[in-house]
């Protein structure tokens, strides 16, 4: 019997099956499940990994992990690193905002250079709820309470209806390897 995630994923991607995707892969459980689903469904995709140099050896190990997965699965892998702290200092932005600005600019550059149809991220239901709560605490207007859009003309987030627990369970049940980012358990960053 197919898992809920597989059914939802297949249904969402049915209309886009002939597209060429660039998947943002950190090495964490969400993005590794996403990459595995793309692979399982024989979709055309490449992987993009950002090393923000924020966790020293751990960041480098994530980069190597993603690179090795791509080699093992015969997938094109784009990888880059940023001096995130310096960028944030120079642009007077927080780490989360700076890292987001850096990665999305790079993803969009890759999309334009290589002709990808969509940039795909592994945002999930928990991210959607977190965004809604943060925006409501900040006092945003109605536009801020909408949350993360599933699809725009350039971005696609097919896991937005799936919870983090469901993704983690799917990874365990399907022997999908991933890396745990120690900063995820920290309260240092407001996303």
Can you describe what each PLM-predicted range is?
Residues 1-135, 165-166, 173:
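ATP-dependent adenylation/nucleotidyltransferase module used to activate substrates
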Residues 118-122, 127-191:
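Catalytic subdomain that performs nucleotidyl-dependent activation
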């Amino acid at each position: 019997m197919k898992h809920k995630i597989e059914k939802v994923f297949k249904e969402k991607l049915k209309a886009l099956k002939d597209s060429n995707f660039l998947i943002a892969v950190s090495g964490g459980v969400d993005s590794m499940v996403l990459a595995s689903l793309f692979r399982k469904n024989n979709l055309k995709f490449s992987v993009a990994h950002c090393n923000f140099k924020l966790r020293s050896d751990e960041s480098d190990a994530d980069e190597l992990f993603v690179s090795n997965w791509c080699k093992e699965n015969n997938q094109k892998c784009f990888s880059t690193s940023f001096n995130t702290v310096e960028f944030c200092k120079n642009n007077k932005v927080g780490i989360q905002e700076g890292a987001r600005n850096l990665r999305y600019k790079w993803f969009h550059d890759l999309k334009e250079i290589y002709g990808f149809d969509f940039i795909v991220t592994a945002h999930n239901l928990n991210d959607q709820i977190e965004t809604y709560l943060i925006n409501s605490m900040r006092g945003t207007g109605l536009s801020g309470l909408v949350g993360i859009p599933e699809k725009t003309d350039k971005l696609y987030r097919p896991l937005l209806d799936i919870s983090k627990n469901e993704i983690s369970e799917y990874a365990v049940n399907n022997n999908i390897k991933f890396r745990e980012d120690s900063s995820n358990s920290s309260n240092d960053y407001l996303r």
